[in-house]
Amino acid sequence: MKVYTGIDIIETERIKKSLEDKNFITRVFTEKEITYCESRRNDARIQSYSARFAAKEAAYKAISEIFEPEIKIDWKQIEIIIDETKRPKVNLKFESEKIKNLSIDVSLSHIKEYAVASAVAVYEEKSE
């Protein structure tokens, strides 16, 4: 078993400026993420996008060593959703046998100026 971690912090003002470009939104976020964030209003909308951006970065940092260089992971292949218990969850949207042996936990937090996320990935290497 190997444990991998990732963390990221982002200024919400940076994401606010990026959100002015529709291409940024559709390039980085999935439909589920966009629907969730757009359901929020004012600062909560920006904080939601910012937290998801940080979570994608943190998750990428935690899993990239496991999957790359075989798989080039892009933004929309890491999806951050809220599960039925109201906790953030990572959905990996690419095919790999390694996903079966992987568990990822993510934690998000934000205030007006910053969003931060941490990710912990536990990978059970199966010997053949």
Residue spans for each PLM region:
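Core catalytic alpha/beta fold that binds nucleotide/phospho-ligands
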Residues: 1-128
